[in-house]
C-alpha cells in the first residue's frame, strides 16, 4: 500500500508522455498516438491512472525514453547525464528540500536491451567503472535514495522479459534494502512497450 502524498517517478520510455516530462527529455508516448502504440492520451498511462485513482499529486515525472539505470547505454556509450543514477544525483539537493512521500523507480529495460554489463550487487566503494554496470549502479541508486530521502516510501517496478540476471539481481537488491517491488507478469505490449491493455 502506497502512502498518501506527493509522488516522484524515475523512469524510462514506459513512464513518459509528451508534455509530462522535463523539457528536452525524449518521450515514447505522444498525444494523438503514433504508429508504434495504441496509447493516445496521458490518461491511458499507468502513472496517470495511479494518480487519478489515489489523488496523489505528482511532484515530477523524471522519465526519459531510452535511458538506463547505469552509466552505459546503447553501443556502449557513456551516459552519466541521462542515466537514472545521474538524474537522481542531479535532483538530489532539490529532493532533499522538498521530499516526496512516494518514489517509484521503473527501469532496467534499456539496461537489458542495450547489452550494458551486468556484474553483481555491490553496496559500497563504487568507482566510475562500477557505475557503468547495471547491478552496482542499481545498488548505488537504492543507497543514494535512502541517504537523500530517508522518510520516502520507495517502490521498484520490475519489467517482464529482462535478462534473468538483471531481474534476479534487482529483486535481491530490493529485498536486502527492504524496498518494495512489483514484478510485472504477462503485460500486453506493442513494440516492446505497454499498450492500453498493458498499462
Residue map of PLM features:
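Conserved SGNH/GDSL esterase-like catalytic core that processes O-acyl groups on lipids
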Residues: 20-119
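Short active-site segment of divalent metal-dependent hydrolases/proteases
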Residues: 14-15
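Structural motif
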Residues: 8-10, 104
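Short hydrophobic segments within beta-strands
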Residues: 10-11, 157
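Nucleotide donor/acceptor-binding cores
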Residues: 5
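Alpha-helical cap/lid subdomain in secreted, periplasmic
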Residues: 78-197
Amino acid at each position: 500500500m502506497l502512502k498518501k502524498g506527493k509522488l516522484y517517478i524515475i523512469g524510462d520510455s514506459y513512464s513518459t508522455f509528451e508534455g509530462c516530462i522535463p523539457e528536452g527529455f525524449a518521450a515514447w508516448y505522444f498525444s494523438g498516438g503514433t504508429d508504434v502504440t495504441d496509447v493516445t492520451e496521458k490518461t491511458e498511462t499507468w502513472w496517470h491512472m495511479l494518480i487519478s485513482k489515489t489523488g496523489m499529486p505528482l511532484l515530477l515525472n523524471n522519465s526519459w525514453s531510452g535511458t538506463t539505470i547505469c552509466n552505459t547505454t546503447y553501443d556502449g556509450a557513456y551516459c552519466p547525464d541521462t542515466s537514472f543514477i545521474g538524474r537522481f544525483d542531479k535532483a538530489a539537493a532539490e529532493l532533499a528540500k522538498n521530499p516526496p512521500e512516494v518514489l517509484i523507480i521503473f527501469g532496467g529495460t534499456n539496461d537489458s536491451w542495450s547489452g550494458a554489463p551486468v556484474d553483481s550487487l555491490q553496496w559500497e566503494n563504487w568507482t566510475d567503472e562500477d557505475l557503468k554496470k547495471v547491478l552496482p549502479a542499481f545498488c548505488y541508486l537504492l543507497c543514494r535514495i535512502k541517504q537523500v530521502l530517508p522518510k520516502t516510501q520507495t517502490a521498484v517496478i520490475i519489467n517482464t522479459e529482462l535478462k534473468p540476471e538483471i531481474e534476479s539481481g534487482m529483486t535481491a537488491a530490493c529485498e536486502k534494502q527492504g524496498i518494495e517491488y512489483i514484478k510485472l507478469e504477462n503485460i500486453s505490449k506493442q513494440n516492446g512497450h505497454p499498450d492500453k491493455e498493458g498499462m
